[in-house]
């Protein structure tokens, strides 16, 4: 999964959404703010920044029945997008063979290929890998969603099967990138491993409210963002002359594209069954802004690690504010939002809001870029404290 981009504050309308919501439970956060005072001690096992006031179980009970009614549909339309294990690539397909007599030579060749790749590229590759390695958090998030969670750990509902099999496919991504980076010798693996542990321990704050409408909109956005991010790291690896690394990033991007197809099909079905409730959910998710899975990233040193990583990704063109707007525009077209009919008054307002949001985001980003000061440099522990321009 991918990155977070920060946009300038702008007023967004609020939409009554009783059609998809039950009485909501609010849980106040006790986590401290991201701008910690010097000398202030971070509480153990807490995120490095404030999380939002948390809302739980916002889906109206009658809406949960929609997902029960879609079991057969999910079996026939979603599970078919999974690949048999024997037909899946595995990390060892792209790495030096440790059982081979030529292992040492293969490792030396790998190191030679990536020797000339610049440090800033490794920042985005490491950030992508860390995001992938926080997979336990993402499975946990999916299993918070009412009506589709795995109730037993081995449930045979198609929703539970999908979540487990999706997790199993995604697990290969972090494994492959982690091993490649370890063998490269270019990065501080202990600092990276600490960052992964911090991130999994902190969790994530997607603001999906145990609500599968919000959850599947979120994952639709995320899978496309990750597809774009890995596709761009593949492109840059090729430009830097490491064709094997380009192949690695490209094969991961292909998985993300297939997963995007599954999640967008689910939301497409929700628009077919409940267009009003679904467009309200989409507007709600976009009004809150899509926070990316690794937004609570921390390495024990840099309180602004995620923002700094995101700035490098923006500068290199790996994942940008333009991509954020493009993803929303793609989804609006994919789900034919402009053509929805029979909506309530609030549904029509939500429809207009999401359809006009992409150009607004682009305009705000253009203004923000025009105000950007000369790039500053900051050290990254992942590359032994060397400084990178943001």
Curated annotation (Swiss-Prot):
Keywords: Chloroplast, Fatty acid biosynthesis, Fatty acid metabolism, Iron, Lipid biosynthesis, Lipid metabolism, Metal-binding, Oxidoreductase, Plastid, Transit peptide. The keyword Ribosomal protein does not apply. Its EC number is 1.14.19.2. Residues 1-27 form a transit peptide. InterPro entries: FADS-2_CS (IPR005803), Fatty_acid_desaturase-2 (IPR005067), Ferritin-like_SF (IPR009078), RNR-like (IPR012348). Fe cation 1 binds at residues 132, 170, 173, 256. GO terms for molecular function: metal ion binding; stearoyl-[ACP] desaturase activity. One of its GO terms (cellular component) is chloroplast stroma. Its cofactor is Fe(2+). Belongs to the fatty acid desaturase type 2 family. Homodimer. This is Stearoyl-[acyl-carrier-protein] 9-desaturase, chloroplastic. It comes from Olea europaea (Common olive). The lineage of its organism: Eukaryota, Viridiplantae, Streptophyta, Embryophyta, Tracheophyta.
């Amino acid at each position: 999964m991918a990155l977070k981009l920060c946009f300038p504050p702008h007023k967004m309308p609020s939409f009554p959404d009783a059609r998809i919501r039950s009485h909501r439970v609010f849980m106040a956060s006790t986590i401290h703010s991201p701008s910690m005072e010097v000398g202030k001690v971070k509480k153990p096992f807490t995120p490095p920044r404030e999380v939002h006031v948390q809302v739980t179980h916002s889906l109206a009970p009658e809406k949960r029945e929609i997902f029960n009614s879609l079991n057969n549909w999910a079996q026939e339309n979603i599970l078919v997008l999974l690949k048999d294990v024997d037909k899946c690539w595995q990390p060892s397909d792209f790495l030096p063979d440790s059982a081979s007599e030529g292992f040492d030579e293969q490792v030396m060749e790998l190191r030679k290929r990536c020797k000339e790749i610049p440090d800033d590229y490794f920042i985005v590759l490491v950030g992508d890998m860390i995001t992938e390695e926080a997979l336990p958090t993402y499975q946990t998030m999916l299993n918070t969603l009412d009506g589709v969670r795995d109730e037993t750990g081995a449930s045979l509902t198609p929703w539970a099967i999908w979540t487990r099999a999706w997790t199993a496919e995604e697990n290969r991504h972090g494994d492959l990138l982690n091993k490649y980076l370890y063998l490269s010798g270019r990065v501080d693996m202990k600092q990276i491993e600490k960052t992964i542990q911090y991130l999994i321990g902190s969790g994530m704050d997607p603001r999906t409210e145990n609500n599968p409408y919000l959850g599947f909109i979120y994952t639709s956005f995320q899978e496309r963002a990750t597809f774009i991010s890995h596709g761009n790291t593949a492109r840059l690896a090729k430009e830097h002359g490491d064709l094997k690394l380009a192949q690695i990033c490209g094969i991961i991007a292909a998985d993300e594209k297939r997963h995007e197809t599954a999640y967008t099909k689910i939301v497409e079905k929700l628009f077919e069954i409940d267009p009003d409730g679904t467009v309200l959910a989409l507007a709600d998710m976009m009004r809150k802004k899509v926070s990316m899975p690794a937004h609570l990233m921390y390495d024990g040193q840099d309180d602004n690690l995620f923002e700094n990583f995101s700035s490098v990704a923006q500068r290199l063109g790996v994942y940008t504010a333009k991509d954020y707007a493009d993803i929303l525009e793609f989804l609006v077209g994919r789900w034919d939002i402009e053509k929805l009919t029979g909506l309530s008054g609030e549904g029509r307002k939500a429809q207009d809001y999401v359809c006009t949001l992409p150009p607004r985001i682009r305009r705000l980003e253009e203004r923000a870029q025009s105000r950007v000061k000369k790039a500053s440099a900051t050290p990254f522990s992942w590359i032994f404290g060397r400084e990178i321009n943001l």
